[in-house]
A protein has these predicted regions:
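Hydrophobic transmembrane signal anchors and adjacent membrane-proximal interface regions, especially
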Residues: 4-5, 107, 111, 152
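C-terminal amphipathic alpha-helix
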Residues: 31-87, 123-190
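N-proximal short alpha-helices
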Residues: 8-9, 29, 89-90
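Short, solvent-exposed, charged loop/turn and helix-capping segments
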Residues: 87-125, 178-190
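Sec-dependent bacterial lipoprotein signal peptides
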Residues: 1-26
Length: 190
């Protein structure tokens, strides 16, 4: 029975769960309204990313289980290609969230809001990097579904992927700490 590597589950799947409080600005189109609009824009891209990311992970798990069960590895290469393509789509969606987050940092809002957006941007950047490496892993699997010849390279790639996801998780935690410390500026969205 061929054993391929098990992808660890991502500990943090991104979702900006906070909306910026408008405080006392009250100006339609002011920096707080702009910030809220930008966060909403980033959230839309991130929601689609999360859906595609989960779809890619499910496709990968199904292919991995089939290879390990002894099914034809060449047939599973197609499923791995599907996982890679879906992960690429997820990666593209996450790229779409980058710009609005950087625009929030440039607005004339409280320092804490800028720090929050900066931490989220760092998290998105780290996750984009990790997902790019995960796409590389899927490409390797397409060529060698049982990792007969590429196991060491795959393990190296996955080590880098895991480091990237850990970096992203740390940045998400920093952003959450900022939000928790500033509930008057950053309110939870339900």
């Amino acid at each position: 029975m061929a054993r391929i590597l098990v992808r660890p589950a991502l500990l943090t799947v991104i979702m900006l769960s906070l909306a910026l409080s408008t405080g006392c600005s009250g100006l339609l189109g002011g920096p707080y309204d702009q910030a809220n609009g930008l966060v909403d824009e980033a959230n839309e891209a991130i929601e689609e990313h999360n859906r595609l990311f989960e779809e890619a992970r499910v496709a990968y798990e199904e292919a991995r289980e089939a290879v390990e069960a002894g099914e034809d590895a060449s047939d599973e290469a197609e499923h791995i290609a599907q996982a890679r393509e879906t992960m690429q789509e997820a990666w593209d969606e996450l790229e779409e969230a980058r710009e609005p987050l950087s625009e929030v940092q440039a607005l004339d809002v409280e320092l804490e809001i800028g720090e929050y957006a900066r931490s989220l941007s760092e998290a998105v950047d780290a996750q984009i990097s990790a997902e790019g490496q995960e796409i590389d892993f899927y490409e390797l699997l397409e060529q060698d579904p049982t990792l007969e010849n590429g196991r060491i390279e795959a393990e190296d790639i996955l080590s880098e992927v895991d480091e990237g996801y850990e970096e992203a998780e740390e940045a998400y935690e920093r952003a959450q700490e900022i939000a928790d410390a500033n509930p008057e500026l950053l309110k939870e969205r339900y």
